[in-house]
Each structure stands twice: as structure tokens, then as C-alpha cells.
């Protein structure tokens, strides 16, 4: 490798914006900020968070309830 052409590889702190957890790793960047980490990600914690975006589930159930009596009548 040629000297003085590679970026410096140093210890950096990775900060999670969601839960506030921080840990050290090595990188060529100064500081790393992540949106979600293994401490708060549902896959790793086993806790699933259901997010109902703008009542889409309720709208679907309402449409399905209207269609069900028509299908039963035929």
C-alpha cells in the first residue's frame, strides 16, 4: 500500500438516535449516528411494535364489513 493516501482508521462512537445506546467500533468516519440499533430493533429484542398508519386497518375492516353481507346474500 502506498503511504499517506488512505484515510485514518480510528475508534469512533456509534450513537443510536432511538434509544440513546452508544458503543465503540472502528471506522474512517468521525462519529456515527444510527436511527435504530440492535438494542432497540424489534428483530433483536423480540418485541414487535404495530404501527397503524392513518387508520388503514380500520378503513380495510370497514370496507370488508360492507362487502361481507353482499357476498353472503348471493
From Swiss-Prot:
One of its GO terms (biological process) is translation. PROSITE patterns: RIBOSOMAL_L31. InterPro entries: Ribosomal_bL28/bL31-like_sf (IPR034704), Ribosomal_bL31 (IPR002150), Ribosomal_bL31_A (IPR027491), Ribosomal_bL31_sf (IPR042105). Keywords: Ribonucleoprotein, Ribosomal protein, RNA-binding, rRNA-binding. One of its GO terms (cellular component) is ribonucleoprotein complex. GO terms for molecular function: rRNA binding; structural constituent of ribosome. HAMAP family: Ribosomal_bL31_1 (MF_00501). Part of the 50S ribosomal subunit. Belongs to the bacterial ribosomal protein bL31 family. Type A subfamily. Binds the 23S rRNA. This is Large ribosomal subunit protein bL31.
Amino acid at each position: 500500500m502506498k503511504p499517506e493516501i488512505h484515510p485514518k482508521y480510528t475508534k469512533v462512537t456509534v450513537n443510536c438516535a432511538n434509544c440513546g445506546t452508544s458503543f465503540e467500533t472502528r471506522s474512517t468516519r468521525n462519529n456515527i449516528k444510527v436511527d435504530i440499533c440492535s438494542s432497540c430493533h424489534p428483530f433483536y429484542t423480540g418485541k414487535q411494535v404495530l404501527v397503524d398508519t392513518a387508520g388503514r386497518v380500520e378503513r380495510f375492516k370497514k370496507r370488508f364489513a360492507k362487502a361481507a353481507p353482499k357476498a353472503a346474500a348471493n
